[in-house]
């Protein structure tokens, strides 16, 4: 089951502040501009039915929880989606088995590699669903972020196959820094989350 760890004081402050700063009547471009001016990691998330500006609420040993002002949450680790709360996907958990190339996608070339995952979905009580991904770099392209800033990013595609699952994840990565600025990731069969960074998270050194 998806577990939401308690936010640290600073991160809880960021969530509370953004809920106050971003009014319900704000359009998303205005909300993104407001949030970008704040000293908090932030992004724009869209699952095809729900779209929101979100801020980082917690870092649980690298598993990040992102929160909207409507209390919708999704979790990711290394930029890879691993859980949702309050979204139609109903993803309790997703985990990579074996080597994790998403710690630095720049190590993946055009020849590609195989990624093994398991998904846990509440709908239909589908837990431990094995999914295999074929991940490779497919080129570079110019990508605009939610503030209209354009970057030339490396594009990676991951073709997914498993019982009742077929689809493609797409990732756009800064070839110089390795920052995953944009992605479109499977959250459930036929449900994708599109994630666009506004301000990346800089983890403090321990």
Language-model regions, residue ranges each:
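Acidic, serine/threonine-rich low-complexity disordered tracts
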Residues: 8-94, 112-206
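Acidic/charged, solvent-exposed loop-and-adjacent secondary-structure segments enriched in E/D, K/R, S/T
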Residues: 99
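Terminal, intrinsically disordered low-complexity segments enriched in charged/polar
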Residues: 103-105
């Amino acid at each position: 089951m998806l577990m939401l760890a308690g936010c640290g004081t600073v991160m809880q402050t960021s969530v509370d502040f953004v809920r106050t700063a971003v009014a319900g009547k704000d359009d998303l471009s205005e909300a993104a501009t407001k949030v970008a001016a704040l000293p908090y990691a932030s992004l724009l998330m869209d699952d095809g039915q729900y779209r929101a500006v979100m801020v980082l609420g917690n870092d649980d040993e690298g598993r990040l929880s992102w929160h909207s002002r409507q209390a919708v949450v999704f979790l990711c680790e290394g930029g890879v989606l691993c859980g949702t709360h309050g979204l139609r996907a109903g993803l309790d958990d997703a985990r990579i088995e074996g080597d994790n190339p998403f710690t630095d996608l720049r190590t993946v070339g055009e020849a590609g590699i195989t990624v093994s995952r398991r998904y846990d979905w509440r709908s239909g009580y589908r837990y431990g669903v094995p999914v295999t991904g074929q991940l490779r770099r497919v080129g570079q392209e110019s990508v605009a972020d939610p503030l209209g800033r354009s970057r030339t990013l490396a594009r990676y595609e991951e073709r997914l196959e498993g019982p009742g699952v077929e689809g493609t994840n797409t990732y756009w990565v800064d070839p110089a820094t390795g920052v995953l600025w944009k992605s479109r990731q499977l959250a459930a069969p036929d449900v994708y989350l599109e994630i666009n960074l506004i301000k990346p998270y800089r983890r403090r050194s321990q």
